[in-house]
Regions:
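A conserved regulatory-domain signal marking ACT and ACT-like small-molecule sensing domains
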Residues: 1-111
Length: 111
C-alpha cells in the first residue's frame, strides 16, 4: 500500500541524510521526497511517499521517531487528505498551435 509520511524535523546539516539513511539501511524505496523549511527557521518539513505493508510502515515510523532530529511524524494516508501533482512545462508555440495548447491546458485547469 502507498503511504505518505510527513516528518517535522530539525533544520540542521545532516538531518535529511539520517532520515533517508534509515530508509536505505532497511532496504526501503522512497518514491517521492520533498523538503522545505517551515515558518519556524529551526524546523523543516519532509514529505516522503513510499510503498509497503502496514506493519513495515509502522516499523519504519517507530525507527524514525527514535531519531534525534525528528520532532513529529504523521502518516497522512491514515486520514482523509487531498493529493495534487505539479508539472512544469515550457512550450514554444506560435499562432494556432499556441491557441490549441492553451485550450488543452484549460481542460486541466493549468495556468
Amino acid at each position: 500500500m502507498r503511504h505518505i509520511i510527513s516528518i517535522l524535523m530539525e533544520n540542521e546539516p545532516g538531518a535529511l541524510s539520517r532520515v533517508v539513511g534509515l530508509f536505505s539501511q532497511r532496504n526501503f524505496n522512497i518514491e517521492t521526497l520533498n523538503v522545505a523549511p517551515t515558518e519556524d527557521a529551526t524546523l523543516s518539513r519532509l514529505t516522503v511517499t513510499t510503498v509497503g505493508e502496514d506493519r513495515v510502515i509502522e516499523q519504519i515510523t517507530k525507527h524514525l521517531n527514535k531519531l534525534v532530529d525528528v520532532v513529529k511524524l504523521v502518516d497522512l494516508t491514515e486520514g482523509s487528505h487531498i493529493e495534487r501533482e505539479l508539472m512544469l512545462v515550457k512550450v514554444k508555440a506560435l499562432g494556432a498551435q499556441r491557441d490549441e495548447i492553451k485550450r488543452t491546458a484549460d481542460i486541466f485547469r493549468a495556468q
